[in-house]
Swiss-Prot record:
Protein's cellular compartments: Cell inner membrane
Residue ranges that the Swiss-Prot or TrEMBL entry lists as coiled coil: none
Description of how the protein assembles with itself and partners: F-type ATPases have 2 components, CF(1) - the catalytic core - and CF(0) - the membrane proton channel. CF(1) has five subunits: alpha(3), beta(3), gamma(1), delta(1), epsilon(1). CF(0) has four main subunits: a, b, b' and c.
InterPro entries in the cross-refs: ATP_syn_F0_a_bact/chloroplast, ATP_synth_F0_asu, F0_ATP_A_sf
Protein name: ATP synthase subunit a 2
Membrane topology term: Multi-pass membrane protein
GO cellular component: plasma membrane; proton-transporting ATP synthase complex
Function: Key component of the proton channel; it plays a direct role in the translocation of protons across the membrane.
Transmembrane regions: 17-37, 77-97, 106-126, 173-193, 195-215
Family note: Belongs to the ATPase A chain family.
Encoding gene, per UniProt annotation: atpB2
UniProt-listed GO biological process terms: proton motive force-driven plasma membrane ATP synthesis
SUPFAM superfamilies: F1F0 ATP synthase subunit A
Entry keywords, A to Z: ATP synthesis, Cell inner membrane, Cell membrane, CF(0), Hydrogen ion transport, Ion transport, Membrane, Transmembrane, Transmembrane helix, Transport
Amino acid sequence: MQSSPLTSTLLFHIGPVAITRPVVTTWVIMAALALVCRFVTRRLAILPDGRQALLEGIVTSVAGQIEDVIRKDARPFLPLLGTLIIFLVVANLSGVLPGVEAPTSKIETPAALALIVFFSVHYFGVRERGLRGYLASFAEPKLIMLPLNILSEITRTFSLMVRLFGNIMSGEFIIGLVVALAGLFVPIPLMALEILVGLVQAYIFTVLATVFIGAAVGSVAKG
């Protein structure tokens, strides 16, 4: 039977904090990514070998996407957005592994990621414009728009969370249902589709985060 996507399996407590299966899966993914990054970035050279050339190509591609949207130097935003898309790709695709639930298929992980984006948007906005200038941007183009602009900040964060959660959760639910009804090998084409959906959702989430940051720093229109 499929468990509710709004509830997670409780594993243990650290003090008053409940540690659930998606939390542990997230920790494992973070540790694995840290080890991989440590390994692949050792012994970087002026003349890159194939591994380094591939890494530089990925970084350049992500930086190019950021600059296309924000129209500013990508370096201040690259650590956040680059980490975000790498984590999302791995987290979304982890559900393909037997016995592993993608942490993004449970509501707490998309909610946490959306909150990270929410606070990062305001951080970059204040850093770029100053506190007064950034707060004044909520009254643009007219003061009457202030409540709507504040509401927009909240609703777009909520939609960012729901979009990621809904797409990944529904993919896992459908595959689990087909496995229960038809056997192990039938859902293989659906798993390929889930991989595609996971990659697309990682890209969309990161692009939307980039757009929100661009709006905060004044590079793209708010909306």
